[in-house]
Amino acid sequence: MDQRLKKALKHADYVTTFKNQKRALKEKFSKDTTVYYCGGQFTATREFISSVLSLRCDIFVDNNSTPIKIKDKEDFYNVLVEAFTKASEEYYTEYKKIVNSERTVQGILDV
């Protein structure tokens, strides 16, 4: 096989593996930012976190379109911030490991 073709195939495998690893990280981040509170399921996003304390209303619609009354908005806010912060830090750390790994399929898989 031509050396250039081998190199191109090796790079294509690397890119595919990198994208798969990145997709897996995104899925984990999405799972880690899911918060269950007062019987509801919420996703901790920057926008949602910002709205929690700024709104006067204490009823929030969860991911399943169910209205949930939040009795302690301060605690709810803290739970959301903690989940988002922890998930973001872990996502960043794991992503950096992939990016800085050896540029081979095995290098990415060893992370």
Where are the predicted features?
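A preference for well-ordered globular domain cores
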Residues: 1-111
